[in-house]
């Protein structure tokens, strides 16, 4: 696990199983990539049919105009999610190219940031 003091030590796969059990009315799928173009392609693939997207773009949040543009181009509402509180970290992390096009941003609640975002989609 990368930097457990920041991100915790729990793997996402077991957490996803927990979320699927907790939110049975939602059809949850998971995609992870370290490749900017793959993230953009996935947004374009699902961004017109999914009911919602939770996007943790990691470091690309602060550097990728292209991912921000991809979020702007799709119709599906996107919630930007971060495990750590990006505003309590280095100043370069305070900039998001995604947030201006997102429905909202949830940051700093550990893996529970994902749970909080999913709760929004259950209350629509």
Question: What role is predicted for each listed range?
Answer:
Residues 3-22:
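Short catalytic helix/loop segments, enriched in acidic residues and glycine
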Residues 23-29:
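A generic structural motif
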Residues 29-37:
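Short beta->alpha junction loops
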Residues 29-30, 79, 88-124:
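Short, glycine-/small-residue-rich phosphate/pyrophosphate-handling segment
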Residues 38-42:
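Short acidic active-site motifs
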Residues 46-53:
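Short acidic/histidine-rich motifs immediately flanking catalytic phosphotransfer sites
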Residues 58-61, 84-86:
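Short glycine-rich anion-binding loops that position phosphate/pyrophosphate groups of nucleotides
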Residues 64-75:
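Short Gly/Thr/Asp-enriched flexible loops that form oxyanion-binding sites at enzyme active sites
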């Amino acid at each position: 696990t990368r930097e457990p003091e920041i991100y915790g030590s729990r793997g996402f796969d077991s957490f996803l199983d927990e979320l699927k059990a907790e939110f049975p009315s939602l059809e949850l799928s998971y995609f992870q990539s370290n490749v900017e173009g793959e993230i953009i392609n996935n947004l374009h693939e699902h961004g017109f049919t999914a009911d919602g997207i939770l996007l943790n773009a990691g470091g690309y949040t602060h550097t990728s105009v292209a991912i921000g543009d991809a979020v702007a181009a799709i119709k599906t509402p996107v919630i930007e999610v971060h495990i750590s509180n990006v505003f309590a970290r280095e100043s370069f992390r305070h900039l998001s190219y995604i947030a201006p096009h997102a429905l909202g941003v949830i940051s700093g609640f550990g893996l529970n940031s994902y749970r909080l975002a999913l709760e929004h989609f259950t209350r629509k």
